[in-house]
Amino acid sequence: MAQGLEVALTDLQSSRNNVRHHTEEITVDHLLVRRGQAFNLTLYFRNRSFQPGLDNIIFVVETGPLPDLALGTRAVFSLARHHSPSPWIAWLETNGATSTEVSLCAPPTAAVGRYLLKIHIDSFQGSVTAYQLGEFILLFNPWCPEDAVYLDSEPQRQEYVMNDYGFIYQGSKNWIRPCPWNYGQFEDKIIDICLKLLDKSLHFQTDPATDCALRGSPVYVSRVVCAMINSNDDNGVLNGNWSENYTDGANPAEWTGSVAILKQWNATGCQPVRYGQCWVFAAVMCTVMRCLGIPTRVITNFDSGHDTDGNLIIDEYYDNTGRILGNKKKDTIWNFHVWNECWMARKDLPPAYGGWQVLDATPQEMSNGVYCCGPASVRAIKEGEVDLNYDTPFVFSMVNADCMSWLVQGGKEQKLHQDTSSVGNFISTKSIQSDERDDITENYKYEEGSLQERQVFLKALQKLKARSFHGSQRGAELQPSRPTSLSQDSPRSLHTPSLRPSDVVQVSLKFKLLDPPNMGQDICFVLLALNMSSQFKDLKVNLSAQSLLHDGSPLSPFWQDTAFITLSPKEAKTYPCKISYSQYSQYLSTDKLIRISALGEEKSSPEKILVNKIITLSYPSITINVLGAAVVNQPLSIQVIFSNPLSEQVEDCVLTVEGSGLFKKQQKVFLGVLKPQHQASIILETVPFKSGQRQIQANMRSNKFKDIKGYRNVYVDFAL
């Protein structure tokens, strides 16, 4: 009588499988595979060979704490002689004297996560022997055409899934600067932290069985991750802070990568890391999504609207000195705002609305009771389809709201100006396999001022008006800020709006910088006044300057001036202005943004003219030099050159340096004091442990500035 077949050991072929599944950057020691793609394993038997006619091998895969056949978190399937279509499948590849090689494949809709793999062997007379073969992790598969995250471009897959560094664009529309970032999605322990993040979500804590079953949907997973990146509803990864007081944590500007943040969250028992702002939330989310296999990129929107009441109007209030006031409505225009786009099919929406989807992890407004935003179809945003899930009205307003300026005087409000094109400029992301910037504004809206753009805006406005009677996706009634804001005379309607006297501009004001605004130097600019009428104009112009946070919140003004300008018909004049370093140095925010404003009025007319300009102060970047050839497992010297751009000494200088595949962990060097206008350098030693294109990111902070940054790309060769 034949003996029952006994398994001696199992080779999961982790190294070979992981290379084929594009997960070898994470590890080759443990099995990480992607759904919809076969992987191989070898069964070694103790007593004899596998006999297909005699032995029946049944595989069992389970994920989550409560595996369930009905929910799809448990699957049972037999070894077949040939590849045949079914949800989970296993087929015979080769059969030897003491071993058998088998291929397995998860369906392209399977839940992602950590799986347990077992087999049952039924050899004869009903005897069944069970074995636990091991664990594996299943990820989304952008290489599989049947997967909802399939991306039909290898360069895009390399950029949006495999690239572990990039740039996040900051500054202002007139001074866009790239901030280098280490995503590090393949670094040690990051995949485990990403899976823990899913398990710490409110969804899992409330109903773990259903949550695990839904992890096959990138729409669902992206919403869960989005909510978990911030800590407003749970023990998410990051605490947000826009107060300029970071004494009990890190200034958001100091971060240069996601790895340190995620590892700190994990090491402290999932206590939120202090602190983040929009680009940090988006960068960490990019790391998690790329690690899970969902193509993701980081997007920056300059002059980004935050419309709190859903009427597509951002109201700004000024006093008679031109100073911007704190907004009682909490509407703001962020100097820049950063979110993510994730690539996925949207079977929950009409056709053509798949592809890039906006997800915003910055906690601004609630969505279905939690702080997350999206996924919102970029195509739906462009077409004004604000009734499509999720949170499309909010994202539409970020890129296409109107801005209304009001003068507050004597308890009354006077309309100064209505701008239909100031919100949503230079929407940017890193180019594919390049360090250049891509402008993708046309993905979000038609050209400003075009007929299509006006039609889309009106369509969105009308949809919001209809929704205001039934509530919104965000659970709040949509209350227009002015009774006419949803009428046919609304901003950018197809009908010509009736103009108030303050809209009839006969005199224009404009600011012009005379020199590039550098940190530590005086700011020199002129106010240009132009009389476009055939009459004399006597102007009184109040000028002011105040620092801004990047979310648009104003700080106290630190400079004021008054100009009296007489203009002949058609005449232009300039009024020179200077703000010295000593005047602004004590008032700067971390973002180094200064808003200069001018409010002009005629002596003989109630007409008022408002103009403002945001100045971003620049400063020298860090220079990084690689000394010699970079080779895996061989010592490498790196020179970091930094300087103090100020005419005063700076204290408490700390340099941080990191780079995936180059440094095992973030390096911190305490530099102490830097003398005025002084340049210095240090040499760091490291041993690269991964080959290919890599990037070094560096940041220097001090008591005067927090984010002097630099980067250097490095190609690491294999060791001979």
UniProtKB/Swiss-Prot annotation:
Localization, UniProt? Cytoplasm
In this chain, Ca(2+) is annotated as bound at 400, 402, 448, 453
| Induction details | By 12-O-tetradecanoylphorbol-13-acetate (TPA) and calcium in NHEK cells.
Q: Looking at the keywords, is Transferase present?
A: yes
Record-linked Gene3D superfamilies: Immunoglobulins (2.60.40.10), Transglutaminase-like (3.90.260.10)
Q: Name one GO molecular function term.
A: metal ion binding
Kindly identify the residues recorded as the active site: 278, 337, 360
Changing residue 113 to C has the effect of: In PSS2; completely abolishes the enzyme activity
Check the record and name the InterPro entries matching this protein. Ig-like_fold, Ig_E-set, Papain-like_cys_pep_sf, Transglutaminase, Transglutaminase-like, Transglutaminase-like_sf, Transglutaminase_animal, Transglutaminase_AS
The main enzyme category here is transferase
The biological processes this protein is annotated with in GO are: epidermis development; protein modification process
- Chief subcellular location equals cytoplasm
Q: Which portions of the chain have biased composition (kind: Polar residues)?
A: 481-496
Q: Which tissues is it found in, per the record?
A: Expressed in foreskin keratinocytes.
Instruction: Cite a GO CC annotation.
Output: cytoplasm
Q: What is catalysed by this protein?
A: L-glutaminyl-[protein] + L-lysyl-[protein] = [protein]-L-lysyl-N(6)-5-L-glutamyl-[protein] + NH4(+)
Q: Where is this region: Disordered?
A: 470-499
Which residues does the record list as N-acetylalanine (modified residue)?
2
Record note on cofactor: Binds 1 Ca(2+) ion per subunit.
- Supply the EC number(s): 2.3.2.13
Q: Which UniProt keywords apply?
A: Acetylation, Acyltransferase, Calcium, Cytoplasm, Disease variant, Metal-binding, Transferase
Question: Which cofactors are reported in the record for this sequence?
Answer: Ca(2+)
Record-stated family = Belongs to the transglutaminase superfamily. Transglutaminase family.
What exactly does this protein do?
Catalyzes the cross-linking of proteins and the conjugation of polyamines to proteins. Contributes to the formation of the cornified cell envelope of keratinocytes.
| Disease per record | Peeling skin syndrome 2: A non-inflammatory and localized form of peeling skin syndrome, a genodermatosis characterized by the continuous shedding of the outer layers of the epidermis. In PSS2 patients, skin peeling is painless and strictly limited to the dorsa of the hands and feet. It is accompanied by painless erythema and spontaneous non-scarring healing. Ultrastructural and histological analysis shows a level of blistering high in the epidermis at the stratum granulosum-stratum corneum junction.
Identification of the protein by name: Protein-glutamine gamma-glutamyltransferase 5
Gene (name only)? TGM5
